[in-house]
Amino acid sequence: MPVSVEISGLLERRLRRLVDLGLYSSVSEAVRDAVRALFERLDLRALALELYTVREASLGYVVEFSGETFEGIIDYMLSRGVPPVIGALNPVDIGVLGGPVLLDPLTVHVIYKSYLADMALKLNDSGLKFYAPHVVAPQVQVLEAIRARRGLNSRFFIEYVEVNVGEEESYGRILVTPLERALVDYARSEGLTLLSDDVRVRSYALRYGVKTLSSLSIAETYITMFGKPPNIEDALMSLKAIPLIIPREVEERWLGITR
């Protein structure tokens, strides 16, 4: 939604002088350039971290604000001693997937950065549908290329859907992106399970009656259907390196540890 700013007095006259000098074609262009210069001077990553810790914004929200990638902002947060709250806080955040699921951008990142991609491929071959908004197609293309360069299977398994992304609004205590809100709306209207590794996005989705689980449900479903994969230790390590929160009891069950 366009933002209107009222400028008058000396500031307005100075802006018009810049136009008169031919430095800008219009006052609007001069204002846009001033705003760009402002953002270039700000430490957007530090401000994004404040949004995350103080305002409880979703990780996607701070990624969008900072202009960083998920990996970039997570690395910055870890360097500041603030691990992201992503993954599953409790076993109830993990379940066996019995039908099609909708992925948010963070979950796409988690899947492709871990061995969940291999599990998702086999589940997809067995009939489980994975949907994602079409706007993440460039992100998926990059992640697939990275996997291919590492010699890993990068066969496509995600089907894209068009979601209606609305304007930026204030959502109260939890700040989520317009895309995240649109995905919650789409999952609710289509009866899909939303896979999100952002605890705050899941909290937002639950408010609207949307079934939502962590991407760790992919591993849970795989183990239920096919048994424990031989590389389960590597799979867990790849998830922890992101770093995803995995409930201890779930990890021990997957590893076959009994107490």
What is each PLM-predicted segment?
Residues 1-7, 19, 81-89:
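Short Lys/Arg-rich basic patches
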Residues 4, 194-196:
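Conserved SAM-binding loop
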Residues 9-29:
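Surface-exposed, Lys/Arg-rich phosphate-binding patches that contact polyanionic backbones
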Residues 27-48:
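Short, basic amphipathic alpha-helical segments that act as recognition/interaction helices
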Residues 41-66:
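Short, positively charged interaction helices/loops
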Residues 49, 63-96, 100:
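Charged, low-complexity intrinsically disordered terminal regions and linker tails
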Residues 96-192, 199-204, 208, 220, ...:
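Active-site-proximal, substrate-binding regions of enzyme catalytic domains
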Residues 215-226:
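Long, charge-dense
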